[in-house]
């Protein structure tokens, strides 16, 4: 009996109430397994220019000049409205932000259960190489390299809000007039009949309001601890009464 009372008391002490509050938990899901759900992205943008170079062993009058190498991205500039009398294509104004062109990678891994699964490796490589205006001579004379040009241009699509200019249209000649658009006339109703009334909008009854449950406190589980504590108190009181009666009977 004493052991039962002690056990119930210990259980009631261990059952501390839980606090109810809003919380958020985040976890990586849908990729159970070892070494799974990995993503590796290595975008590389390496412009290489080699132009206007000379490699000579025995040569004379072998210059290299006036060569040009470029790796550029065309950027849109802010447009301005045209003046009076200009076309519609030149009078539209737009403002776009220039963005650099290059290699990029977008990827994700999801829903890959297993070992070593769900891996995503993306290696976009953008390597523009310019090789122009170069000479390699062993025995040469008067072998110049000049006036060459290498370019790698990346044009941007029209930005948001920009529209392509309309195709040119030929105006009518002198003295000619544009034909009027065709008109569609509805035939009149026959004699003796009345025109049908226009359809009236149907009256829609609003839906009945949905009853929402009132807010209530969360159940923290403290009711069980109160019952265990009450049972422990009853057992202790009964044990004390039985102990005193046993002492009284043994003394007679």
UniProtKB/Swiss-Prot annotation:
A motif (LPXTG sorting signal) lies at residues 217-221. Belongs to the chaplin family. Long chaplin subfamily. Induction: Transcription is coordinated with that of the antibiotic undecylprodigiosin (Red) locus. Transcribed during aerial hyphae formation on minimal medium, about 10- to 25-fold lower expression than the short chaplins. Weak expression in aerial hyphae (at protein level). Expressed during aerial hyphae formation and early sporulation on rich medium, under control of ECF sigma factor BldN. InterPro entries: ChpA-H (IPR005528), LPXTG_anchor (IPR019931). NCBIfam families: LPXTG_anchor. The keyword Ribonucleoprotein does not apply. It is found in: Secreted, Cell wall. The modification Pentaglycyl murein peptidoglycan amidated threonine is found at residue 220. Residues 1-20 form the signal peptide. The keyword Transmembrane helix does not apply. Keywords: Amyloid, Cell adhesion, Cell wall, Peptidoglycan-anchor, Repeat, Secreted, Signal. Disruption phenotype: A single chpA disruption and double chpA-chpD knockout have no phenotype; a quadruple chpA-chpC-chpD-chpH knockout has delayed aerial hyphae formation and sporulation. A quintuple chpA-chpB-chpC-chpD-chpH knockout has a longer delay in aerial hyphae formation and an almost complete lack of sporulation. The quintuple knockout still expresses ChpE, ChpF and ChpG. Quintuple knockout chpA-chpB-chpC-chpD-chpH has strongly delayed aerial hyphae formation, makes many fewer aerial hyphae but no effect on viability of the spores produced. Residues 86-108, 210-224 have a biased composition (Low complexity). Its main location: secreted. Residues 153-165 have a biased composition (Acidic residues). It comes from the Bacteria. Residues 219-252, 221-252 form a propeptide. GO terms for cellular component: extracellular region. GO terms for biological process: cell adhesion. This is Chaplin-A. It is a peptidoglycan-anchor. One of 8 partially redundant surface-active proteins required for efficient formation of aerial mycelium; the short chaplins assemble into a hydrophobic, amyloidal fibrillar surface layer that envelopes and protects aerial hyphae and spores, presumably anchored to the long chaplins. Chaplins have an overlapping function with the surface-active SapB peptide; chaplins are essential on minimal medium while on rich medium both chaplins and SapB are required for efficient aerial hyphae formation. Residues 31-71, 112-152 form the Chaplin domain. Residues 71-121, 150-224 are annotated as: Disordered.
